[in-house]
């Protein structure tokens, strides 16, 4: 079908991630239906015929190839899940398409705070720039680029599902707690460390991909003061 240039949709039913690099390269549309249950067929038809605008996001990373996965017998977190994977994903954690488009802008938060501050506000504007009403899952991730201990490449710290009519824009507010900004040291103690924290907000995780353009906005927060221990 694909070779004959017949418009084709690959409907995939799976309980977890699969290696589908050939399909991603050659099939113009892929719908992951997971396990839809009794009314799964109706839901798939509603999406395919445009009666429902999809807004689902991946709860797992779709890797480009099996070799990207760590050895099954290794319990080291290096390379596991979106939090520690440093390669290029086929489809990243948090990714999902819609029949409309969303644009992120005006990411605002304090540029510097003390390590002991309990709540730090983050605001971002999301606009539906397409021609169809739809829902978006706004996701906030943080990373610690200058830490010398093992920390995640990125970590989800908040998300909100919003509904926007075509052309509508909304300002979304998150609040980052001390625990959100903390790291766990080699002794298992959770601490807020002085230094830079990168904040990224968008429609998926801010990781390198083979197929999906990165649509996030980012800023940086400077934490000053002494190390603040949360768990004692």
Indicate residue ranges for each PLM-predicted region.
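Cell-envelope/glycan interface and biosynthesis
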Residues: 1
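Secreted, periplasmic, or luminal enzymes acting at the cell surface/secretory milieu
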Residues: 4, 11-135, 141, 194, ...
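Short, conserved secondary-structure segments in the cores of folded domains
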Residues: 110, 158-160, 188
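Intrinsic-disorder/low-complexity, polar/charged segments enriched in Ser/Thr/Lys/Arg/Asp/Glu/Gln
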Residues: 119-121, 169-173, 216-218
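Short acidic, flexible loop segments centered on an aromatic residue
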Residues: 131-148, 154-156
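Intrinsically disordered, low-complexity Pro/Gly/Ser/Thr-rich segments with frequent PxxP/GP/PP motifs
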Residues: 148-184
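Terminal connector regions
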Residues: 177-231
């Amino acid at each position: 079908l694909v070779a004959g240039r017949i418009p084709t949709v690959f409907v995939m039913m799976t309980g977890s991630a699969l290696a589908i690099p050939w399909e991603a390269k050659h099939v113009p549309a892929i719908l992951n239906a997971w396990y839809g249950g009794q009314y799964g067929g109706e839901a798939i038809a509603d999406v395919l015929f445009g009666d429902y605008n999809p807004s689902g996001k991946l709860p797992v990373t779709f890797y480009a190839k099996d070799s990207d996965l760590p050895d099954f017998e290794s319990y080291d977190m290096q390379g596991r899940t979106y939090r520690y994977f440093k390669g290029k994903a086929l489809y990243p954690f948090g990714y999902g398409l819609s029949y409309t488009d969303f644009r992120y802008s005006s990411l605002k938060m304090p540029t510097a705070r003390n390590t002991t501050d309990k709540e730090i506000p983050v605001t971002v504007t999301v606009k539906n720039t397409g021609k169809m009403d739809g829902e978006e899952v706004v996701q906030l991730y943080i990373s610690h680029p200058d830490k010398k201990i093992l920390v995640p490449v990125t970590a989800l710290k908040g998300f909100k599902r919003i509904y926007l009519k075509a052309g509508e824009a909304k300002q979304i507010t998150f609040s980052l707690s001390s625990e959100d900004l903390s790291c766990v040291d080699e002794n298992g103690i959770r601490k807020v460390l002085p230094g830079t924290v990168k904040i990224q907000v968008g429609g998926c995780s801010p990781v390198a991909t083979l197929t999906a353009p990165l649509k996030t906005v980012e800023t940086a927060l400077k934490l000053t003061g002494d190390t603040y221990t949360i768990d004692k």
